[in-house]
């Protein structure tokens, strides 16, 4: 497998979102390498996207979204679950891709269908907010044998507050994959 480098992330968010499907999320934890194949993502296109955390401008919570591409934006939801996003596009754009589900590949003992569950299984928490994904402990890699995938597009989950943006088909997943959180 080959680690994804900064130019991969410094592209249009929709392109990055679709290209992440089938790649490996890798986290080295206490001498153990956890690997999951990304099977579901959601694109958040920037400050004009009403469902995006960046839609109301830069805050202490979402500042990482406005930073350079290729960093992890990790935040807490419901006071108990972490979610991991991949920052995309140019600095100050405020765009990211939420990793929603993984298919376990190595050393993942828990369920990974849903952003909170996958963060728990991969031991990703807020301490990794801002982590450079081109580093050595938490990164995304292209598998040597990545097969072509059929991509399905649906509306994002849990963004009913976002008006017309709630219905845009910005959730992408590998069609017929059993580890997708919701069809």
Question: What label would you give each PLM region?
Answer:
Residues 1-183:
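Conserved, well-structured core segments that form or line functional sites
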């Amino acid at each position: 497998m080959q680690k994804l480098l900064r130019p991969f992330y410094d592209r249009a968010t929709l392109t990055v979102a679709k290209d992440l499907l089938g790649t490996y999320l890798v986290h080295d934890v206490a001498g153990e390498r956890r690997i999951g194949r990304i099977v579901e993502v959601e694109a958040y296109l920037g400050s004009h996207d009403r469902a995006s955390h960046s839609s109301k401008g830069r805050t202490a919570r979402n500042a990482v979204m406005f930073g350079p591409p290729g960093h992890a934006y990790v935040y807490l939801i419901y006071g108990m679950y972490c979610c991991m996003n991949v920052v995309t596009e140019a600095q100050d754009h405020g765009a990211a891709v939420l990793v929603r589900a993984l298919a376990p590949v190595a050393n993942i003992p828990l369920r990974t269908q849903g952003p909170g569950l996958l963060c728990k299984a991969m031991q990703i928490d807020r301490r990794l907010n801002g982590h450079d994904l081109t580093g050595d402990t938490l990164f995304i890699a292209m598998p040597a044998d990545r097969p072509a995938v059929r991509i399905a597009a649906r509306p994002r989950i849990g963004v009913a507050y976002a008006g017309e943006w709630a219905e845009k088909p910005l959730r992408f997943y590998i069609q017929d994959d059993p580890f997708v959180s919701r069809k």
